[in-house]
Amino acid sequence: MAATLPRDRLRQITDRFEYLEAQLNGGPDPSDIAKISREYAELKPVVAEIAGYEQLLADMAEAQNMLADPDMRPLAEEELPRLEAAIPAAEQSLQLALLPKDAADAKPAMIEIRPGTGGDEAALFAGDLLRMYTRYAEARGWRLEIVDLQESDLGGIKECTARVEGENVFARLKFESGVHRVQRVPETESGGRIHTSAATVAVLPEAEDVDIDIPATDIRIDTMRASGAGGQHVNTTDSAVRITHVPSGIVVVSSEKSQHRNREIAMQTLRTRLYDLERQKADDAMAADRKAQIGSGDRSERIRTYNFPQGRMTDHRINLTLYKLDAVMLGDLDEIVDALTAEDQAMKLAEMTG
């Protein structure tokens, strides 16, 4: 077995999988079912990769032994080239499966979108990004819920927070964090000149109660009237909720019609922001040791340009250019996400094996 795939580690993974399977079949404590099922589901494809890889190694050993038998030698000589080609591919596939998983990948996510430079056009583009992510969520069967939305006078957005729930949400959206730049002729531009503006996207993994504990003494809760486009009040009751986390200064707002629901959403958003702060601190602490990552990891980094006159989208982190901007803005993001994920895995694999 290759040095990068020690037999004892593979055996430990298989043993753990078999233990979890026995636990599920034996009727675990109801409070443990979700945790056991999640770990079992995560290990199942890894164990399948291990089984396939070890079967190839066994077939290779058998074929090499057959070379000594004159009657079996022709069959072995026919089989060996196939195995010699299959084993490296299987080993790489298994190495990818063994890469450390981000514990947040399976979590729901919060998407925060804010216009940057560019005035009204930036606010309109921020609205376009929200619609793009909404359509992407619909295409993947996810549930996207608007937590807070402040609209601009021309139909764009001043600020938006949305919650997305579904399978592998954070894993698929985490590379969207950064500055998105747009180049196009604004509808209000009579001279036909191309303007450049930008919007900032932050994708945060949603925190669970067990991730972050917030003492009641650390928060201040205020109620107010929800506001719509231009700042006008959209209802006559103080239903919107603003929560301030005093130690950090973080402020979150939820402005749905139900004040009770707004308290729940605002607290969830606050937990997520604080959880994200903890993750950023941990990332910063590891930065000196980290040799490979997609982009700088800085949310102020320009990650992508959307050029409407050319129908072009360019992701600057991996030098990916696609000439299907209309489809991208309609939520066709899988090709981009897949390319970013593949590059991230390749860099981590190179670091692990190099």
Curated annotation (Swiss-Prot):
InterPro entries: PCRF (IPR005139), Pep_chain_release_fac_I (IPR000352), Pep_chain_release_fac_I_sf (IPR045853), Prokaryotic/Mito_RF (IPR050057), RF-1 (IPR004373). SMART domains: PCRF. Keywords: Cytoplasm, Methylation, Protein biosynthesis. GO terms for cellular component: cytoplasm. The keyword Glycoprotein does not apply. Peptide chain release factor 1 directs the termination of translation in response to the peptide chain termination codons UAG and UAA. Belongs to the prokaryotic/mitochondrial release factor family. This is Peptide chain release factor 1.
